[in-house]
Structure formats: C-alpha cells, structure tokens
C-alpha cells in the first residue's frame, strides 16, 4: 500500500478518502503561530463529483488511489454498454451507460476520449473539449428576429444534443461545440 503524507498533498494527485477515489483540487499548508501545523485540502470525489473541504494534521497520511487514464476511441454502443478500443493494444473496453451519463451526446464513432479506471473498473469518461457535429434540425425563426444581433435559436445535432446557435446556422451545417459548456463555438466550412 503506497501512501501520501499530508505534507505531500499536491493539486492533481489522486488519493483514497472514505473508501472512495478523490482528486486533490487544492491544498494549503498552514503553520499557525501556536500549535501544530495542518493542511487544508479541497477534494473532488471522482465517483460522485462532490467537492469537499477537509483539514489534515501534518502527521496524517492517505492511500494513493490506483487511478489510470487511457485515451481510447469510441466504437459503438448496444443500448446498455458503450464500447471503446485502445488503438495501441487493440483491447476493447465496455463502459456502462450510467458511467457515460450526459457525455453520450458528445460521442461520435472513432472519436477519442479519456476513460478513467479505478481498480481496473471504468468510473468516468471525458470527451474531447471540442467536437464537430452536423445540425439536423433548427428552430423556426421569425422575420424580425435578425434585428437583434445577439439572437439565437435552438439546433438539434446529429447525436441528439440541443444547443443554441446563431440565426445563420441552417440544417446540414457542420458546427464546432465546446463539450464542457455545451455551447456553440463556430461554424465549420
């Protein structure tokens, strides 16, 4: 069992806290004028995405989480599982739809994404920051809508995602979308 002592807690390190893998988002070493020093830490639980703040004594230690991140290509889904392949080893990995969650609207076949494993079990996926998707339906607009330059309309994309787009986007357009915010970025020509 490998451990990190509290004075080695750094941003980006992954540890086990309360039997759950956590990511250290920030840590601050505090040495008060009187008393024992301590470390104030913000942890993000990787299974529930919950953010917690915790204070550890300088003598505390936590186990290092067995977290591995792979860059895999999305192949297909059968409704319950989503299948990915490692392009280096050609090993396939199936991920339950519950783990895919809201990211399924950003996945296209052959796109790469990061799959995070804990004890060789998938716990999360992270799609590319930007994806290019085809518009298959747009909301009807009124003739006077073009007066306001900040006007937008809803567009349905090939994966089923719905995003706000400028009025000039039409059915068949290829657009770039930021998967972190779900917002339109630009039109692809």
Swiss-Prot record:
Main location: cytoplasm
Keyword Metal-binding among UniProt keywords: no
Pfam families: EFP, EFP_N, Elong-fact-P_C
Keywords, sorted A to Z: Cytoplasm, Elongation factor, Hydroxylation, Protein biosynthesis
BP GO annotations: peptide biosynthetic process
One example GO MF annotation: translation elongation factor activity
Localization per Swiss-Prot or TrEMBL: Cytoplasm
Post-translational modification: May be beta-lysylated on the epsilon-amino group of Lys-34 by the combined action of EpmA and EpmB, and then hydroxylated on the C5 position of the same residue by EpmC (if this protein is present). Lysylation is critical for the stimulatory effect of EF-P on peptide-bond formation. The lysylation moiety may extend toward the peptidyltransferase center and stabilize the terminal 3-CCA end of the tRNA. Hydroxylation of the C5 position on Lys-34 may allow additional potential stabilizing hydrogen-bond interactions with the P-tRNA.
Metabolic or biological pathway, per its Swiss-Prot or TrEMBL entry: Protein biosynthesis; polypeptide chain elongation
An example Gene Ontology CC term for this record: cytoplasm
Residue list for modification N6-(3,6-diaminohexanoyl)-5-hydroxylysine: 34
NCBIfam families to which the protein is assigned, alphabetical: efp, PRK00529.1
PANTHER family membership: ELONGATION FACTOR P, ELONGATION FACTOR P (EF-P) FAMILY PROTEIN
Function recorded in the entry: Involved in peptide bond synthesis. Alleviates ribosome stalling that occurs when 3 or more consecutive Pro residues or the sequence PPG is present in a protein, possibly by augmenting the peptidyl transferase activity of the ribosome. Modification of Lys-34 is required for alleviation.
Family statement drawn from the similarity comment of this UniProt entry: Belongs to the elongation factor P family.
Protein name per the record: Elongation factor P
Organism annotation: Buchnera aphidicola subsp. Acyrthosiphon pisum (strain APS) (Acyrthosiphon pisum symbiotic bacterium)
Gene for this chain: efp
């Amino acid at each position: 069992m490998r451990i990190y002592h509290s004075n080695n807690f750094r941003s980006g390190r992954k540890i086990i806290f309360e039997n759950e893998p956590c990511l250290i988002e920030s840590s601050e070493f505090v040495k008060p004028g009187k008393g024992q020093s301590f470390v104030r830490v913000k942890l993000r639980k990787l299974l529930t995405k919950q953010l917690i703040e915790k204070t550890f004594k300088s003598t505390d230690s936590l186990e290092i989480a067995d977290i591995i991140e792979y860059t895999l290509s999305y192949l297909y889904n059968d409704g319950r599982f989503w299948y990915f392949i490692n392009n280096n080893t050609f090993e396939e990995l199936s991920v339950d739809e519950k783990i895919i969650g809201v990211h399924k609207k950003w996945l296209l076949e052959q796109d790469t994404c990061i799959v995070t494993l804990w004890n060789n079990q998938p716990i999360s996926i992270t799609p590319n920051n930007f994806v290019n998707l085809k518009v298959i339906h747009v909301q009807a607009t009124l003739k006077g809508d073009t007066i306001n330059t900040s006007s937008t309309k809803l567009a349905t994309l090939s994966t089923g995602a719905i995003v706000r787009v400028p009025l000039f986007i039409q059915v068949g357009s290829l657009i770039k979308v930021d998967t972190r915010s779900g917002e339109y970025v630009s039109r692809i020509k």
